[in-house]
Amino acid sequence: VVTNILRQIEEAGGEVRTRCRMTDIEVEAGAVRSVTLTSRAADGTLCEERVEVSAVALACGHSARDVFELLRDRGVAMERKTFAMGVRIEHLQANVDRALYGPAAGNPVLGAAPYKLSEHLPSGRSAFSFCMCPGGYVVSAASEPGGVVTNGMSLSDRAGENSNSGLLANVFPTDLPGDDVLAGVALQRECERAAFTAGVGGYVAPAQLVGDFLCGEASSAGGSVVPTYPRGVAWGSIDGCLPPYIVETLRAAIPRMARHLHGFDAADAVLTGVETRSSSPVRVTRGDDGQSVSTRGLWPVGEGAGYAGGIMSAATDGILAAQKLVAALS
């Protein structure tokens, strides 16, 4: 898919730059004037190229923290937004299949059972499953040194022994201290570094059994569910890796979720931390025309801009943004 997209761009007269990143954006009189691209030559020398532009489609990822800092420093309008953090929860896939399919569990026509759960608590907070991976694996998704970040994936056959899902709770702008628009990024980093420390280094992840978590006790060993995180886990407590309001929200939500999915609160299910990158903690504010409200010619798009929260929503936002950009240039 990507190869065909690149080919079509080049056939239409476009240029594709690889192995480079945007390291500066020039804003003059409230409009974008140029971007600076930095790449590394074969001999290791850093090369910079200034490209004059009248329009920039800013479609960075939700973990492009260097871009967020650059935009803030250049005075581009941004705002805090609600995001979510938590852990990965793993169960035996066979148990999930039995809970959802009953006697039909194991039928190859059905395959591995997926689930989607959410719970609204009396506290006013909510917890929810995210990016559930049937027959899948917990993976490492760190993008900065000294931090542990988890994510999940399934191979095409969904034949892994475990299921896993993000188990998240919201972080609201009002939960964040101070007035820095990137306070959410700072909180993500704090949790990721705490997880790195709890995992005793080497990008080992902290892990805890659900039964121990619900009782507020640290875990010393695993049970029947073998963690799939590839760097290994350090048994203990995840309490110190996340803000107390997230820990308490997850602790209250798990038994309630088990009312809808039998066994979700199984004592030997595994929590692996931390999951901090489900969505962007900031939004690059744009108007109805799709452009930045502060910087003409800058078109924030997709997850990193804070207008999408997954593959399909990001793709849809990209299509709509492209249509508005083409209309503005026509």
Named regions from a protein language model:
Residues 1-330:
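Residues forming the flavin
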